[in-house]
């Protein structure tokens, strides 16, 4: 109230908490009868209770002399229930329905907020309720009548058969032994309705004596509702601060949460979803939807969500396929899980699903039989993969479920390029794991190219020819301009320039450089290897020998970032093939933010030059003639000097492998002892072998040179 004087205190009442009946006091409610019609004056014939379940049954007499009682109907019910012959087990011994049973049900499981109050001599005594039960008439006698009817019918059918029939033939009995019950089966059995019913039935009934409202025993028990020694010191429950007293009197309700309808564990409302962090929202949506365009994701998250933050979050849980986002395999198949169909581990499932996703980056269509042949997975697992992201078309195969999203591709080129780098790394991994033939595969996954079915083959060839002619003309003009500049150099008087023919070897080098393919397909990547139409080394007026890049290039931000990556990588790995280095570099690019300087395009030549400039050397491993290693896998680079005590040991080891493809351990150990002039311990030899080599079939190979 705004003015406390308008709300004066009329009376102060002491409140006491009585606990004598706290574990025994129940409140009975009769919802089918008005409060004015009580059962107090009706004879109670019997009472029983199951304390653990808080289940009560009361038997009350029916006034058969009441003019409203239908005697003929009562006799008929008694006859149906007990039959014509009365015995000790009869429900109605008087052959008349003269009693009815009331069975209880719990109204609430949380009664901590309820109490019975007794006001006496200016004091309010509260006793907590142990349970609140509603009693309704039970019609179990109808079940007994049905059972009697079925028994009579069975007896009649048995009586029709001949009395002179021979004894039944001996029947064979099959004995079965139950298998040991697993923990999951036991939990399912314990949670079943049948088990709960059996558990409830096992609890014995406790028979009670009923005392009427005015009985002396009832009067005696009613005294326990008063707190003993209310003026003494014992009753300290309510000697609390006002806030503590209010909390005790009205504790926070937990019942509302229990009463809410329980939704399935995999269902989450949009209201609940938006209370979660953004990253969790994206993960839950993608895990449930599997495939989604970016525009749809933004509409589900709400208009107030920043698209940049969503882009950052979606790349952690999904991959870009044809402009749409497909949930990552490790989200659907977490570690330590397995296939419900075949039981294969999650790692194998993720690899197979990644192959399906990668196939859809190449084409709109995928054939299930081809996927099963490559991945060696069962048909059910492959079908699950395809159903996540495709729809089946009769006599055609599986088509990607969503149309190509060209709008997203145009709007977010940085994200597209980053995803392309990730797919390049995944492709390299799939080629190695599944031993895919490189000739049958595209050279590189196109950076989320448009749908293949929209442009025919002739049109593609014509477009490619046109672009090649345009680029060739531009490069020719730039080359002529550079030649003109080189023809009139500033030569001091009296200086004669010696002219020598260009060696065929140099021409071949130039041709080889011109044929080298850059690692990316970005427009800026066209100039990473060619400067004004000339190879980098030639355009700058100096060749790149022994890994030293052209003057001026080492100081650029791109060169510095690239060198830092190369040095850090070789400090960890020591020996890498060019193929593995490119894969690690693509993964490094995928972890960088959009717009980073390294996205400008790095060619193979520039990467190799940076490796050699970082203190590494190329090891010319003599691969066997029948090797299946690609040219990039045959280029092996190793850290020559790292500044630690193992440099000399590592250099000796690398010299051994420059003359041998594979070596035995005893040969390595003897050579190390010979070159270093001392006997090396087993730990020192193990360290240098672990840094640079792998063991296979009793032989040691440089890392990356073993062909599976």
Curated annotation (Swiss-Prot):
GO terms for biological process: defense response to virus; DNA-templated transcription; innate immune response. Residues 502-519 have a biased composition (Acidic residues). The keyword Phosphoprotein applies. It holds the Pfam family RPC5. There is a cross-link at residues 171, 432, 498, 659 (Glycyl lysine isopeptide (Lys-Gly) (interchain with G-Cter in SUMO2)). The keyword Nucleus applies. It is found in: Nucleus. This is DNA-directed RNA polymerase III subunit RPC5. Keywords: Antiviral defense, DNA-directed RNA polymerase, Immunity, Innate immunity, Isopeptide bond, Nucleus, Phosphoprotein, Transcription, Ubl conjugation. Component of the RNA polymerase III complex consisting of at least 17 subunits: a ten-subunit horseshoe-shaped catalytic core composed of POLR3A/RPC1, POLR3B/RPC2, POLR1C/RPAC1, POLR1D/RPAC2, POLR3K/RPC10, POLR2E/RPABC1, POLR2F/RPABC2, POLR2H/RPABC3, POLR2K/RPABC4 and POLR2L/RPABC5; the stalk composed of two subunits POLR3H/RPC8 and CRCP/RPC9, forming a structural mobile part that protrudes out of the core and functions primarily in transcription initiation; and additional subunits homologous to general transcription factors of the RNA polymerase II machinery, POLR3D/RPC4-POLR3E/RPC5 heterodimer and POLR3/CRPC3-POLR3F/RPC6-POLR3G/RPC7 heterotrimer. GO terms for cellular component: cytosol; nucleoplasm; RNA polymerase III complex. Residues 556-708 are annotated as: Required for Pol III complex stability. Residues 146-170, 485-552 are annotated as: Disordered. The modification Phosphoserine is found at residues 161-162, 192, 503, 522. Its main location: nucleus. The modification Phosphotyrosine is found at residue 224.
């Amino acid at each position: 109230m705004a003015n406390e004087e308008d709300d004066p205190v009329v009376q102060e009442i002491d409140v006491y908490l009585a606990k004598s009946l706290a574990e025994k006091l129940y409140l009975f409610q009769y919802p089918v009868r008005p409060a004015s019609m009580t059962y107090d004056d009706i004879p109670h014939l019997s009472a029983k209770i199951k304390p653990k379940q808080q289940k009560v049954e009361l038997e009350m007499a029916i006034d058969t002399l009441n003019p409203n009682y239908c005697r003929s109907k009562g006799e008929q019910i008694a006859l149906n229930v007990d039959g014509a012959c009365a015995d000790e087990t009869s429900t109605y011994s008087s052959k008349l329905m003269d009693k009815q049973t009331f069975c209880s049900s719990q109204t609430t499981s949380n009664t901590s907020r309820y109490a019975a109050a007794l006001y006496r001599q200016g004091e309010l005594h509260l006793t907590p309720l142990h349970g609140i039960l509603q009693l309704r008439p039970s019609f179990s006698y109808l079940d007994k009548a049905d059972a009697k009817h079925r028994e009579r019918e069975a007896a009649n059918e048995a009586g029709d058969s001949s009395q002179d029939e021979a004894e039944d033939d001996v029947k064979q009995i099959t004995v079965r032994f139950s298998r040991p019950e697993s923990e999951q089966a036991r939990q399912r059995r314990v949670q079943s309705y049948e088990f709960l019913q059996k558990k409830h039935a096992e609890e014995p009934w406790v028979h009670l004596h009923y005392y009427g409202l005015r009985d002396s025993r009832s009067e005696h028990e009613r005294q326990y509702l008063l707190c003993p020694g209310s003026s003494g010191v014992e009753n300290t429950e309510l000697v609390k601060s006002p806030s503590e007293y209010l909390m005790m009197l009205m504790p926070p309700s937990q019942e509302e949460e229990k009463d809410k309808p329980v939704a399935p564990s995999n269902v989450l409302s949009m209201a609940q979803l938006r209370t979660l962090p953004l990253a969790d929202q994206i993960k839950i949506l993608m895990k449930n939807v599997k495939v989604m365009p970016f525009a749809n994701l933004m509409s589900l998250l709400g208009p107030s969500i920043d698209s940049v933050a969503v882009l950052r979050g979606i790349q952690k849980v999904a991959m870009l396929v044809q402009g749409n986002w497909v949930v990552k395999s490790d989200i659907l198949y977490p570690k330590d899980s397995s296939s419900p169909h075949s039981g294969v581990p999650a790692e194998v499932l993720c690899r197979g699903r990644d192959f399906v996703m990668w196939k859809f980056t190449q084409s709109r269509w995928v054939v299930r039989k081809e996927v099963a042949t490559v991945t060696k997975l069962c048909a059910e697992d492959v079908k699950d993969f395809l159903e996540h992201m495709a729809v089946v078309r009769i006599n055609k195969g599986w088509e990607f479920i969503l149309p190509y999203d060209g709008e997203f591709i145009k709007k977010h080129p940085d994200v597209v390029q980053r995803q392309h780098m990730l797919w390049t790394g995944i492709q390299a991994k799939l080629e190695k794991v599944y031993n895919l033939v490189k000739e049958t595969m595209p050279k590189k996954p196109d950076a989320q190219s448009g749908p293949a079915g929209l442009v025919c083959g002739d049109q593609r060839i014509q477009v490619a020819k046109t672009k090649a002619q345009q680029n060739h003309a531009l490069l020719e003009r730039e080359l002529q301009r550079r030649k003109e500049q080189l023809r009139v150099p500033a030569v001091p008087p009296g200086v004669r320039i010696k002219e020598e023919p260009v060696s065929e070897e140099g021409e071949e080098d130039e041709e080889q450089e011109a044929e080298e393919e850059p690692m990316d397909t970005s427009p800026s990547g066209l100039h990473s290897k060619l400067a004004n139409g000339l190879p980098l080394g030639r355009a700058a007026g100096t060749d790149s020998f022994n890994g030293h890049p052209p003057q001026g290039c080492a100081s650029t931000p791109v060169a510095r970032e690239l060198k830092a990556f190369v040095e850090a990588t070789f400090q960890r790995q020591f020996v890498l093939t060019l193929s593995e280095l490119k894969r690690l570099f693509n993964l490094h690019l995928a972890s960088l933010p959009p717009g980073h300087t390294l996205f400008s395009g790095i060619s193979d030549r520039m990467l190799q030059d940076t490796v050699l400039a970082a203190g590494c050397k190329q090891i010319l491993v003599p691969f066997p003639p029948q090797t299946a290693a690609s040219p990039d896998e045959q280029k092996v680079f190793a850290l020559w000097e790292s500044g630690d005590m193992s440099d000399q040991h590592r250099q000796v080891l690398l010299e051994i492998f420059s003359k041998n493809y594979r070596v035995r351990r005893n040969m390595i150990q003897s050579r190390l002892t010979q070159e270093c002039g001392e006997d090396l311990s087993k730990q020192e030899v193990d360290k240098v072998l672990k840094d640079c080599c792998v063991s296979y079939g009793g032989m040691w190979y440089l890392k990356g040179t073993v062909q599976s």
